[in-house]
């Protein structure tokens, strides 16, 4: 198969869809890999490394899309890429269709096979291609929350760890999944007082047993969240419904419960956000204020640490990329139900029910068509 790795063009997105070592694995299996010129530079990989791995370097993004049967990316195609995606082409990347109607319509119109990293789901409901970036995003969420808690950045002027005789900051983590756990661990390691919420009692029991002593668990309800907000300094939103829009756990009226300078970090923004007042921001302009509350809502948080993120992502995606290249997407999906669950679009049809429901479009089950 001909596999293409274009350069990401989303704002300050420095990750790349595949490392040179991943390319080498595909070449070893007889596939052809096209990498766009300088695609890996932001992650610390030069063209020469890809060439040594066996890739062919192409000068422009148009060339990569034209030559490739399958595109392997990091982030969803953005508007300049829409015309480049063609019927029958496999695009394997993070899509987050549930919060991008224009993208949804464009990919349906293209007739491409869109396989979303974030909805590849095992029988145990784990999301193997979301986990590595969730681990990065959770760690970064706490770091960014601490940074914007500084007075010069609009925050309260508190140190996360405090000092002897001075109370540490209080951090509220909404959602006890991979992002939330990572965020809570980093916050705890920094010395903050941490509360993590979830609706799953077994998950809360697990977190209570495994977390450091300065992390407390709390059942997630509107009442409990409202009770926590007046004394919280940093709120990290990390709730996820696979493939669907994130629930709004903090509404605009709840901002009045918080002290001015409280920092909200919405990691769920790529699924629409879990704060009513959230809207997507970028690494070049990451924060804004609403009623004196700092909002950080960058949709590609791991893009700020691209070397780590790219390696972690390739470690997770490579086995699926190999299966798709070796077998073709249809056979690969027949053989692996987790990969089949990742197919969101095909031949102009929406094959993922949650996305179809969000946008009110017809849902076409994939199984009879694979």
Predicted regions: what is each one?
Residues 2, 8, 77-169, 298-300:
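Glycine/serine-rich phosphate-binding loop and adjoining beta1-alpha1 elements at the start
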Residues 6-42, 152-237, 287:
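Glycine-rich phosphate/diphosphate-binding loop of Rossmann-like nucleotide-binding domains
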Residues 69, 75-76, 95-96, 221, ...:
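Short glycine-/small-residue-rich Rossmann-like dinucleotide-binding loops
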Residues 209-291:
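Rossmann-like adenosine-cofactor binding region
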Residues 2-106, 110:
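An N-terminal-biased, well-structured beta-alpha scaffold segment characteristic
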Residues 23, 47, 104, 142, ...:
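Generic hydrophobic/aromatic pocket-lining and core-packing "Φ" positions
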Residues 118-159, 269, 274-370:
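Adenosine-phosphate binding glycine-rich loop
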């Amino acid at each position: 198969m001909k596999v293409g790795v274009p350069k990401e063009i989303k704002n300050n997105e420095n990750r790349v869809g595949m490392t040179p070592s991943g390319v080498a694995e595909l070449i070893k299996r007889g596939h052809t890999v096209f990498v766009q010129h300088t695609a890996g530079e932001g992650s610390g990989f030069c063209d020469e490394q890809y060439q040594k791995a066996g890739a062919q370097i192409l000068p422009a993004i148009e060339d990569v899309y034209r030559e490739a049967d399958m595109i392997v990316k990091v982030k969803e195609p953005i508007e300049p890429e829409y015309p480049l995606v063609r019927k029958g082409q496999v695009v394997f990347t993070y899509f987050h269709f549930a919060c991008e109607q224009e993208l949804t319509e464009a990919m349906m119109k293209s007739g491409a096979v869109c396989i979303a990293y974030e909805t590849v789901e095992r029988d145990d409901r784990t999301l193997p291609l979301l986990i590595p970036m969730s681990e990065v995003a959770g760690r970064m969420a706490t770091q960014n929350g601490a940074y914007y808690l500084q007075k010069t950045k609009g925050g309260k002027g508190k140190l996360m760890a405090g000092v002897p005789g001075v109370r540490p900051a209080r951090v509220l983590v909404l959602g006890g999944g991979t992002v939330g756990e990572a965020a809570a661990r980093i916050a705890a390691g920094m010395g903050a007082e941490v509360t993590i919420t979830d609706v799953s009692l077994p998950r809360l029991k697990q977190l209570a047993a495994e977390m450091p002593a300065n992390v407390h668990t709390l059942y997630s309800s509107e009442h409990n969240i409202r009770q926590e907000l007046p004394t919280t300094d940093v709120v990290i939103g990390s709730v996820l419904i696979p493939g669907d829009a994130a629930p709004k756990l903090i509404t605009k009226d709840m901002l009045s419960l918080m002290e001015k300078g409280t920092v909200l970090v919405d990691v769920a923004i790529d699924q629409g956000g879990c704060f009513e007042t959230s809207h997507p921001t970028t690494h070049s302009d990451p924060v804004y204020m609403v009623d004196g509350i700092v909002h950080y809502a960058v949709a590609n948080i791991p893009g700020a640490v691209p070397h780590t993120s790219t390696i972690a992502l390739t470690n997770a995606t490579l086995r699926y990329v190999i299966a798709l290249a070796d077998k073709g997407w249809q056979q690969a999906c027949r053989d692996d139900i987790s990969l089949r669950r990742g197919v969101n679009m095909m031949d102009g049809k929406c094959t993922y029910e949650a996305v179809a429901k969000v946008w009110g479009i017809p849902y076409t089950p994939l199984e009879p068509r694979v």
